[in-house]
C-alpha cells in the first residue's frame, strides 16, 4: 500500500482514484467472486476460492524454488546469478518461459516469448514440474539435491561479498 501511495503521489494522482493498482485489484477480486457466486451459488464461490488458493500456493512454491538458498547483497542490483533457471523444453512450454527466470529479473519489460535462456546462469537440476513435485511431496530430497547445487553456486556464481554473507550464516 505504501509503495502504491508513493507511486501515485509522485505522479500527482488521487490515491483513491482508479489509477490505484491495489484498489483495481481488490475490485476485480470482488467482481470475480461475485460472478462466481451468481453463476454457481455457494458451490461456485467455493470452487473459485479453492482454485485461487491453489494457484496462489503453487505460485509461492515456484517462487521458493526459483530463489532457494541464493543470497544477494542488500541494495545490489538483481543479476542473472540470483535466481535458478531451467532449460527444460516442457517446463518452458507449459509455464510460458518462467524457466528463464534470470532474464525475467534482468529485463522485466520483455514479453515472455522474448526472454532468452541464459547458459551462464544457475540451473535447476530438473525441470520446474519435477522440482515442484519434489518440493511439495519430498522436501527432504529437494533439500538434499539443492544443497549440492548451492555448493556449486557458491563456487561458480557468488561474489566475494555474497560469500561473506554465506559464511556468516553458518
Language-model-detected regions and their locations in the chain:
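Core segments of transmembrane alpha-helices
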Residues: 24-36
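Transmembrane helix interruption/hinge and helix-loop junction motifs
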Residues: 38-46
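Cytosolic/stromal cytosol-facing helical appendages immediately following the last transmembrane segment
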Residues: 1-22, 48, 54-170
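Short, conserved, surface-exposed binding loops centered on an aromatic residue
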Residues: 36-39, 51-54
Amino acid at each position: 500500500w505504501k509503495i502504491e501511495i508513493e507511486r501515485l503521489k509522485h505522479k500527482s494522482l488521487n490515491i483513491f482514484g482508479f489509477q490505484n493498482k491495489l484498489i483495481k485489484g481488490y475490485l476485480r477480486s470482488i467482481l470475480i467472486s461475485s460472478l462466481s457466486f451468481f453463476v454457481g451459488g455457494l458451490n461456485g464461490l467455493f470452487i473459485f476460492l479453492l482454485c485461487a488458493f491453489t494457484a496462489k500456493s503453487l505460485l509461492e512454491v515456484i517462487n521458493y524454488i526459483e530463489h532457494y538458498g541464493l543470497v544477494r547483497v542488500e541494495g545490489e542490483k538483481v543479476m542473472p546469478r540470483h535466481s535458478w533457471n531451467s532449460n527444460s523444453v516442457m517446463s518452458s512450454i507449459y509455464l510460458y518461459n518462467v524457466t528463464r527466470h534470470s532474464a525475467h529479473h534482468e529485463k522485466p519489460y520483455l514479453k515472455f516469448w522474448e526472454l532468452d535462456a541464459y547458459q551462464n546462469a544457475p540451473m535447476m537440476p530438473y525441470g520446474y514440474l519435477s522440482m515442484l513435485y519434489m518440493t511439495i511431496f519430498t522436501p527432504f530430497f529437494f533439500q538434499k539435491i539443492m544443497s549440492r547445487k548451492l555448493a556449486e553456486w557458491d563456487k561458480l556464481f557468488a561474489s566475494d561479498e555474497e560469500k561473506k554473507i554465506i559464511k556468516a550464516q553458518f
